[in-house]
């Protein structure tokens, strides 16, 4: 499957910052991301070298991996640029994305509903076109 550059890294970062107060979907926004590449949203439990990775948990609040997960290496080689670590259920344990450490992730279209799932942050950012993937 081929992806086209539908949004720039800078535009993606702008959208994420714009949506964050409404959605609470980002744990770490990668403001110093390289400008080249197709923006990609990563769940906050995927190791990213040099980028804070907390699994949306206070116990990992300051953890910065020294290596990339295999999927991150493959995405980078394919031309993708990580722009955000998205909120999730703490340590991937749950299905609501109502997280005590990072706060609840709000539904992309209805603030009276939950985002749901362990990957709620990724889901709502994708639904609101913060990045193509």
Language-model region placement:
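Short, well-ordered alpha-helical
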Residues: 1-64, 68-69, 91-93
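Short glycine/serine-rich loop segments
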Residues: 73-133
């Amino acid at each position: 499957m081929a992806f086209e550059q539908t949004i720039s890294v800078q535009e993606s970062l702008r959208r994420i910052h714009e949506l964050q107060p409404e959605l609470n979907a980002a744990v770490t926004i990668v403001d110093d991301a390289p400008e080249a590449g197709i923006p990609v949203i990563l769940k906050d439990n995927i190791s990213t070298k040099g980028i804070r990775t907390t699994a949306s948990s206070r116990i990992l609040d300051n953890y910065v991996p020294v290596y990339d997960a295999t999927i991150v290496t493959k995405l980078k080689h394919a031309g993708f640029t990580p722009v955000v670590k998205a909120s999730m259920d703490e340590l991937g344990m749950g299905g609501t994305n109502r997280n005590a450490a990072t706060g609840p992730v709000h539904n992309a279209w209805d603030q009276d509903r939950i985002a749901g799932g362990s990957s709620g942050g990724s889901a709502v950012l994708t639904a609101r076109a913060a990045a193509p993937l």
